[in-house]
Amino acid sequence: MLDKLVAQYSAIIESLGEDVNREGLRDTPKRAAKAMQFLCRGYNQSLEEVTNGAVFESDTDEMVLVKDIELYSLCEHHLLPFIGRCHIAYIPNGKVLGLSKFARIVDMFARRMQIQENLTRQIAEAVLEVTNAHGVGVIIEARHMCMMMRGVEKQNSVMSSSVMLGSMRNNPSTRSEFLTLVHSRRAL
């Protein structure tokens, strides 16, 4: 696959009128191909692999929230990055997930070409699948380079998307607690 990507990046560079053999660009097709493989490595990962059995029995039945998980993804429309933060909460149902696994789930889905709305849903559904939680809430806030570097060129826009499942969707007080906790900004 790497050789095919290298050839395609060479063709793109030449199509833009550049000399792919000039000093500054000579290794660019290979570097760009490797970068794209890294940025899309989520296609080669599975939920079972990234969670690695880190689900533990627990009597905890109150909300668990992990805030400000940084994420980097590629918009499927322009192949430009969007960069942001993900907040995940769940109401355990006899099981809790190892803390680092939330970041791994976010990365697995973020390292694919897609739109933010789908990314938000994929993360929520994965957490629900792994934990069998009573409820799951996910909010992503991100800046999209496709809107900042091209098109309307708006530098300060932030897109927010949310998915609420189970009690996070059906119980207004649970949903409100999640939103309040996400929006509280207390320095540690």
From Swiss-Prot:
Keyword set, alphabetical order: GTP-binding, Hydrolase, Metal-binding, Nucleotide-binding, One-carbon metabolism, Zinc
Positions of Zn(2+) binding: C75, H78, C146
Pathway(s): Cofactor biosynthesis; 7,8-dihydroneopterin triphosphate biosynthesis; 7,8-dihydroneopterin triphosphate from GTP: step 1/1
Catalyses which reaction(s): GTP + H2O = 7,8-dihydroneopterin 3'-triphosphate + formate + H(+)
MF terms in GO: GTP binding; GTP cyclohydrolase I activity; zinc ion binding
Pfam name, any one: GTP_cyclohydroI
Group of enzyme by EC: hydrolase
Biological-process GO terms, alphabetical: one-carbon metabolic process; tetrahydrobiopterin biosynthetic process; tetrahydrofolate biosynthetic process
GO CC terms, sorted: cytoplasm
Keyword Nucleotide-binding among record annotations: yes
InterPro entries, A to Z: GTP-CH-I_C/QueF, GTP-CH-I_N, GTP_CycHdrlase_I, GTP_CycHdrlase_I_CS, GTP_CycHdrlase_I_dom
Enzyme Commission number(s) from the entry: 3.5.4.16
SUPFAM superfamilies per UniProt: Tetrahydrobiopterin biosynthesis enzymes-like
Binding partners and assembly: Toroid-shaped homodecamer, composed of two pentamers of five dimers.
Record family assignment: Belongs to the GTP cyclohydrolase I family.
HAMAP family, per the entry: FolE (MF_00223)
Name of this protein: GTP cyclohydrolase 1
Protein source organism: Hahella chejuensis (strain KCTC 2396)
